[in-house]
């Protein structure tokens, strides 16, 4: 993702942390990434795609549980990405993964 999108994600993270009473200057932070290392770069990419597909499918299932509300603010960013994706005429998870790579 580009610098503007990274900043937007960090701003959202900070906003949610502050809303829950955390001092964002004095807490430990952790980032996680889906990665793979392989001599065959296509195989490494395919492995990551499988995990990313599972993550997106889990997101779809989770959003069926929650209604839009302030309590699901963390989902709003991803819901917005899904809306943009669907408005572009895409519907399947593999195409959503391709869209993520384009970002």
From Swiss-Prot:
Alphabetically, the GO molecular function entries are: alkanal monooxygenase (FMN-linked) activity
- EC number assigned by the record: 1.14.14.3
Q: Which reaction does it catalyse?
A: a long-chain fatty aldehyde + FMNH2 + O2 = a long-chain fatty acid + hnu + FMN + H2O + 2 H(+)
Q: What class of enzyme is it?
A: oxidoreductase
Q: Which UniProt keywords apply?
A: Flavoprotein, FMN, Luminescence, Monooxygenase, Oxidoreductase, Photoprotein
| One GO term of the biological process aspect | bioluminescence
> What SUPFAM superfamilies does the annotation carry?
Bacterial luciferase-like
Keyword hit for Oxidoreductase: yes
Top-rank taxon, per record: Bacteria
Misc note: The synthesis of this protein is regulated by a complex control mechanism that has been termed autoinduction. In fully induced cells luciferase comprises up to 5% of the soluble protein. Strain ATCC 14547 is luminescent.
What is known about its subunit structure?
Heterodimer of an alpha and a beta chain.
Primary role: Light-emitting reaction in luminous bacteria.
Protein name (Swiss-Prot/TrEMBL):
Alkanal monooxygenase alpha chain
Which organism's genome codes for this protein? Vibrio cholerae
């Amino acid at each position: 993702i580009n610098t503007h999108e990274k900043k937007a994600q960090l701003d959202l993270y900070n906003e949610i942390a502050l809303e829950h009473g955390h001092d964002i200057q004095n807490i430990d932070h952790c980032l996680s990434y889906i990665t793979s290392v392989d001599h065959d770069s296509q195989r490494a990419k395919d492995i990551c795609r499988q995990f990313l597909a599972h993550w997106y499918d889990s997101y779809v299932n989770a959003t069926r549980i929650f209604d839009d509300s302030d309590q699901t603010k963390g989902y709003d960013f991803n819901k917005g990405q899904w809306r943009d994706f669907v408005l572009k005429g895409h519907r399947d998870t593999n195409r959503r993964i391709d869209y993520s790579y384009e970002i």
